Structure formats: structure tokens, C-alpha cells
Design a protein with these regions (language model features):
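Extended, charge-rich low-complexity interaction segments
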Residues: 114-123, 202-204
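Acidic two-metal-ion nuclease catalytic site recognized across multiple nuclease folds
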Residues: 131-204
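Conserved beta-strand -> loop -> alpha-helix junction used to position metal-binding or nucleic-acid-contacting
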Residues: 79-92
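Catalytic phosphate/metal-binding cores of nucleic-acid and nucleotide-processing enzymes, i.e., regions
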Residues: 96
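Active-site catalytic microenvironments for nucleophilic, acid-base chemistry
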Residues: 74, 92, 131-135
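Conserved non-catalytic scaffold segment of RNase H-like nuclease domains
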Residues: 1-82, 101-119
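Acidic, divalent-metal-coordinating active-site segment for phosphoryl/phosphodiester hydrolysis
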Residues: 122-133
Length: 204
């Protein structure tokens, strides 16, 4: 889906299935591998997707770390544009009462967007687009989400672990035995407990 931020408008969208021999995620997305191999113009769909990608400034996904791993393999093109994660990089307004890393479903419902299906790419994109349409501070959220980030470990005791959890840090993910989260320098300054960097800063 190609979304234009200033006008809060969906400009174009496309959905198609890539043929596959098996689908380990069938129980989640409901796509049977034989269905993916039925005759359909998937190459034309892929060409349309590549045209949308060429027009985009930023690639956004919910749980971008999962989605970006598939690009540059098989028929999917490599993506060299900035990635932005609507689950981890965007700090949604406190009045929406969302967890630090909300699901697409929870995010949609917090903005009054009805949820009628889940775990399909286009429906997830529709939910996100409708959230963006309702988000008055979208430009600020996106700009702050694109700030360089690095992985930090929270320096909290066992008794204080709730402070890290409430700040969106994850235990054992991706570092075993540690509370960690990717943060910008601005976000680090706002924390109420000390942290230590675990990697060099990088853009999305």
C-alpha cells in the first residue's frame, strides 16, 4: 500500500500470493500452499508492488524486523530504503492506553478502527492506514520514529524489573538474560533508570 502522509490518503494498494510448495504459517494466515499455486497474475502484482516501492520514501511495517528478512530472497526485491516499525519505533500517545509494543489489533481498536480479520498483509495495511488517517500527530510520530536508534540494556535490579517492563523493554529478547530495547538518544534522556548501549547507533 502506498500512503501519502500530508493528505492522510491511500494512493494505491495491491495484494497477491507468491506460489509456494508449503506454508508453515497456514494455521495463522489461512493460506493453503495449493491455493498459492492456482493460476493468477502474481508477476504483474509483484511488478505493481515494485512500482509502489519505487515511489515510497520510507517502508513501514508492523514488526518490521520480521517482514524485512524476506526481501532480497527469491522473487522479492531487496529494499534499500529506510524501514520504520509501527510496533517498536513509534511512540503512540499515552491517552490511547497502549502497551509499549502494541499488536495491530490493539492499535486499530485504540483508534476506533474495526478489526474483521487478522494476519493477512493487506488487511493489516488497511488497519494501519486507517490509524494514520485518525492520527493528528502523525508527522511528529514518524519523524521521531526515524531517529537513529541503538539497542540498550536496562540497569535495574530484580526488584525494579517492572520499571523496565513498563518502559517497553523486553526480557531475553534479543539478548539472553537482559531487559533490552532499541532507543533514540532523546528517549534515553527521558528514562528514569540507567541503561547501557549494546550496539552502535543506526538508522531504521
Amino acid at each position: 500500500m502506498l500512503f501519502e502522509v500530508p493528505h492522510r490518503a491511500v494512493l494505491s494498494q495491491v495484494s497477491f500470493l507468491l506460489p509456494c510448495d508449503s506454508n508453515d504459517a497456514e494455521a495463522i494466515n489461512g493460506i493453503a500452499a495449493p491455493v498459492s499455486r492456482l493460476p493468477q497474475p502474481w508477476r504483474s502484482g509483484l511488478a505493481c508492488f515494485e512500482a509502489l516501492l519505487e515511489s515510497a520514501d520510507v517502508v513501514l511495517a508492523h514488526n518490521a524486523a520480521f517482514d524485512r528478512q524476506w526481501f532480497g530472497h527469491g522473487p522479492l526485491p531487496a529494499i534499500h530504503k529506510p524501514w520504520l516499525c509501527s510496533m517498536e519505533d513509534l511512540r503512540w500517545p499515552a491517552e490511547r492506553q497502549l502497551r509499549a509494543n502494541p499488536s495491530v489489533r490493539d492499535l486499530a481498536l485504540a483508534y476506533g478502527v474495526p478489526v474483521w480479520a487478522a494476519h493477512r498483509a493487506l488487511t493489516d495495511c488497511i488497519y494501519l492506514a486507517q490509524v494514520f488517517e485518525r492520527c493528528d500527530e502523525l508527522e511528529q510520530l514518524l519523524a521521531q520514529g526515524l531517529e537513529p536508534r541503538r539497542l540498550y540494556r536496562a540497569r535495574v535490579s530484580y526488584e525494579e524489573r517492572h520499571r523496565a517492563r513498563e518502559a517497553g523493554f523486553r526480557w531475553n529478547d534479543p539478548v539472553s538474560g537482559a531487559w533490552t530495547r532499541r532507543l533514540s538518544e532523546r528517549e534515553v534522556q527521558r528514562l528514569s533508570f540507567p541503561v547501557v548501549p549494546l550496539e552502535e547507533p543506526c538508522s531504521a
